[in-house]
Amino acid sequence: MNHDYRTIDLFGLTFNLTNILMITVASVIVLLIAILTTRTLSIRPGKAQNFMEWIVDFVRNIIGSTMDLKTGANFLALGVTLLMYIFVSNMLGLPFSVTVGHELWWKSPTADPAITLTLAVMVVSLTHYYGVKMKGLKEYSKDYLRPVPLMFPMKIIEEFANTLTLGLRLYGNIFAGEILLGLLANLATNFYSNSFFLGLVGTVGAIIPMLAWQAFSLFIGTIQAFIFTMLTMVYMSHKISHDH
C-alpha cells in the first residue's frame, strides 16, 4: 500500500504532480457540471437545471441555518463551489486508483492532507477577510477580547484548532476509505500468485465487501462534503455576526 508520487522540482520547490493532476481533474469536472446544467436556463427547467437548482437550494438552506439569508447570499457561490468540488474530489478515488510502477497517479485529491489543510486554510482565511470587511478592523479585533481580554490566547488556539480539525477530518475519512478499498483489492489479487483457483476464490470473496465498502464510502464522501460546507458557513457566521 506504500506508493510514491511523481514530483518535480521547480524554483527550489517540490510539486506533487499527482495532486496537481487530480486537483485539475476535479476542477474540470465541476466546471463541466456547472456549464452543462446552466447553459440553457428556462422557466420550465429540464432535469439538468433542476439538479443544479436543487444543489443551490440545498446550500441556501445550509446558509440559512447559520446566518441571515440577506447577508448569507454573498456566500452562496462559495458554498455551492465547495460542496460540488469536495464531493467530486471525494468520489474520484472511489471506483479505482491508477498506479504506474510504484507511483500513484489517480486517487481522491482529498485523501492528501496537504490538499485538505490548504482548503481549510483558504476558507478560514476567507472568514477573517469578510469579518474585517463587514465589521471593520477595529470592531473585528475586539471580538478576540470578548467577553474578557484574558480570552485572547484561547481565541487564537481556537482558530488553529478549527483549521486543523476542518482539514484533517476530511482527509482522515477519505484516506481511510481508500486504504481499506486497497487492502480488499490486494486480498482479491494476491492469491493468484499461489494458484488461479485460490485467486478466483479470493476475488469472489472480496467482491461483496468491496461493494459494501464503496457504498459506505459514497455515503461518507457525501456527508464530509456537507460537513465541510456547513462548518465553513458556521465559521463565516461567527466572524461576520455582531453578536460574536
From Swiss-Prot:
Ranges annotated as spanning the membrane: 17-37, 75-95, 112-132, 164-184, 196-216, 217-237
SUPFAM superfamilies: F1F0 ATP synthase subunit A
Assigned keywords, A-Z: ATP synthesis, Cell membrane, CF(0), Hydrogen ion transport, Ion transport, Membrane, Transmembrane, Transmembrane helix, Transport
UniProt keyword Aminoacyl-tRNA synthetase present: no
Gene3D superfamilies: ATP synthase, F0 complex, subunit A
Record-level Gene Ontology MF annotations: proton-transporting ATP synthase activity, rotational mechanism
Gene Ontology biological process terms, A to Z: proton motive force-driven plasma membrane ATP synthesis
UniProt GO cellular component terms: plasma membrane; proton-transporting ATP synthase complex
Membrane topology of this protein: Multi-pass membrane protein
UniProt similarity note: Belongs to the ATPase A chain family.
Assembly description: F-type ATPases have 2 components, CF(1) - the catalytic core - and CF(0) - the membrane proton channel. CF(1) has five subunits: alpha(3), beta(3), gamma(1), delta(1), epsilon(1). CF(0) has three main subunits: a(1), b(2) and c(9-12). The alpha and beta chains form an alternating ring which encloses part of the gamma chain. CF(1) is attached to CF(0) by a central stalk formed by the gamma and epsilon chains, while a peripheral stalk is formed by the delta and b chains.
Described function: Key component of the proton channel; it plays a direct role in the translocation of protons across the membrane.
Protein name in the entry: ATP synthase subunit a
